[in-house]
Amino acid sequence: MKLCGVRGSGVSLMRSSNFPCFRAAHNGGAPTATRHQSLCGRCLDSHMGAGKRWCFRPLLAEPRRYGSASSASTTDAATAPVHGEDLYVSHYAIPEDARRLVGTPQLLPRNPAEEVAFKKNLIRSFPQACIRNVSVVAHVDHGKTTLSDAMLRFSNLLPADGATGTFTDRLKVEKERGITIKAQTCSVLLTVRETGTQYLVNLIDTPGHVDFQYEVSRSLCASEGAALLVDVRQGVEAQTMAQFYAALEQNLTILPVLTKMDNVMSDAEVEKTLLQLEDSTGLLSREVILTSAKSKQGIEQLFQQIIDKVPPPRGREGFSDMKQLPAMHPDSADRKKVEKELVPLRALLFDCWTSESSGMTDGAASAPVSTVSSVSSGTTAASGGQSVAKDGIYGLIRVMDGTVTPGTTVTFFHSGKKHEVREVGIIHPTLHPTAALTAGMVGFVFFPGLLKKDVFIGDTLCTLPTRKHTMRVVATGPPETASRTKPATAAETASSDDASGSSGSSVVEPIPGFKTVQPVVFAGFYPDEGVYITQLREAVDLLCVNDPSVTVEQLQCPALGPGLQLGFLGFLHMQVFKERLLMEFGQTVLVTPPQVQYMYVEQHGDPDDPAQRKPVSVSNWRWPHEGVGAYLEPFITATVLTPSEYLNEINSAALSAFRGEMQEMRVIDGARTLVRYRMPLADLARGFFSTVKSSSHGYATLEYDDPTYMTADLVKMDIVINKAHISALSTICLRHEATTHARRIIGSLKENLLRSSVDLPLQALVGSKIIARETVKAYRKDVTAKIHAGDISRKQKKWNDQKKGKERMARRSVGTVTLDQSVLAAALGATTAR
């Protein structure tokens, strides 16, 4: 075995002068990447001595490790991790690229006169047989975005010689947090060298966190295949299985992919992960694709598997509007023939954005100058002078049947409203206008002047080419009420048309939408001092176009004024939304403590029946005497992965302060421990996440699954200041914790409220019962300062007059106390303390 001996610190290569066996072969000097010789253990032992370790890596001239020979270098060896005498020859080497595929990006011509012809040729070259739609799904931090970036570089959309980054993470908050929040689409053009066949591969990079599972479900609806990524060292994790089952529900072709093969230390790690994947999903080990995004290996094989195994779309092809054809005489035979061949447009709207919340502003920053048009304010300007306008809404669609072009008037199925399409195109890798989007393609459409209230994610965009075409009447409301199934095939669509054709008309069916998602975390958002609620409402509405899973309701608080109650899919979702409000719209907001979604059932109801459960909150609270049979509290399974030295502190806090129950604990790799707790979602909101981060100095990670509901003894606690209810401080808690919780809030208010000319009573109520009370004493003037001697009755008279005056002032100032945001923020912080 030829070996490269490298110091564990990664400082430099060993010099041969220290080793007789090496010196005899090389006559001194430092070895290079191509001049390594065998080193005997005797020389190493005599030079290093006991207790010192070296890193050994087999040369790529021998049977390969996890990579190709082209990736070998002295720098790679010098930075290798230390693993002592773990010498091995990999049986899971990544195959070298066959160089059968080449990226052929099609650039907009600089000459405006050539642009129209270019757009037409771009579409003509892509029949459905040459289109592939694939979503990239995985657990958190398993390498989805990095692999997507490497795929874009392989296809020449990004510089091939650049370092692999995170191009598809376009939002500022994504770049700062280092996670994917929004699913991003990019169309890749590949050509087979042998045959010259060109393929259009639409890649959708999806988030991995459970809070953004709604993004994943929408992306899967627009795909025929899913690349299921698994980190070779982490193995199969919770979201891996969640994404697998989501893809299975959609009847998608699943391609298993192992990522980060450059981090592997032994074959045992690969074999363990392959066994996990096969046992948990049934995907065969021999079908797994090995990749390394950082070294850009295995990318061509992944693309080849996408082309070979993912089925092409099967929609009905054809024009969908007479405006898409040259002008014809109304009574001509050619026109009648063409009208019979028109195919109604059916397109699934699975994402929307505005120029303010697009995340496309920095899209061209890292792309080659020759391949990306100028990007400004979320819009892409074509080289020919045309630009995608800003004042409107962009929609990301998957065309099922027909064709959509600029100027096509489409009907939104569930609202029945018609809007004209101004621009269409693909994302390549930024907004890239084309002449049309045909059946099977994924691309964007732009609607000028479209209002947010007219847009429903999951709606069907359609056209009625002739009078014989009609739309099926559906119930009004958001389209997310139906569960998504596999897109109808051309045969199924044709059979539907045949069934209705006997009556002389053709019924256009809507595309099934997405499953309804219920928010699990609620928080009140109030504008910063000096900011009007209208500005906050406009910013929230624009952001909700891009994030439709957020629910919005109006709030009115006597202390804070008007606000909004927003519902989110999780705590990370709430934090990200708040950060996007600040980064994209400059809105600083005061956020009340997050409240989880509690449920109740009527008297004589079954708590185990989800159909009988109804949501309850502080705004619509009902007591048992009002017909409530039982309250239900959400519980989650929290998974903590922490360095072992921090385990005791985290475990103690989880069991004692956050009502956690340990379900599982296992050592991962000798240095890290995985622990699973069953705990209330409310306790997670009140500070368990912060405790995990602070106890582990930021090294531990925490994830949780979807909540399940269990019965609990809940009460609503109200805070009253000077006889005025402060709705922002009302909360739902367990009955036995209400007193402790109340004293903490009342104590914080007493410390931070400014004194006034009258006493301010502070009360915490459960129903009509006072469970905690404090008083902020009023300022008192020393009315006896000028009385130096004499009868005490003179002083008592002054004191009594002062007391009566205070009582008169108190009667006039009932409920008129004004809270500064700093005071309320301190009280809100007390609600999350343990």
From Swiss-Prot:
**Which is a Gene Ontology cellular component entry for this protein?**
mitochondrial matrix
Q: Where is this region: Disordered?
A: 475-507
Question: What residues bind GTP, as annotated?
Answer: 138-145, 205-209, 259-262
> What is the protein's membrane topology class?
Peripheral membrane protein
Which keywords appear in this protein's UniProt record, sorted alphabetically? GTP-binding, Hydrolase, Membrane, Mitochondrion, Mitochondrion inner membrane, Nucleotide-binding, Protein biosynthesis, Transit peptide
InterPro entries attached to this UniProt entry: EF-4, EFG_III/V, EFG_V-like, LepA_C_sf, LepA_CTD, LepA_IV, P-loop_NTPase, Small_GTP-bd
Domain tr-type G stretches: 129-314
Tell me the superkingdom of the source.
Eukaryota
Targeting signal (transit peptide) range: 1-66
**Which PANTHER family does the UniProt entry name for this protein?**
TRANSLATION FACTOR GUF1, MITOCHONDRIAL, TRANSLATION FACTOR GUF1-RELATED
Sequence similarity: Belongs to the TRAFAC class translation factor GTPase superfamily. Classic translation factor GTPase family. LepA subfamily.
Q: What does this protein do?
A: Promotes mitochondrial protein synthesis. May act as a fidelity factor of the translation reaction, by catalyzing a one-codon backward translocation of tRNAs on improperly translocated ribosomes. Binds to mitochondrial ribosomes in a GTP-dependent manner.
| UniProt-recorded name of the protein | Translation factor GUF1 homolog, mitochondrial
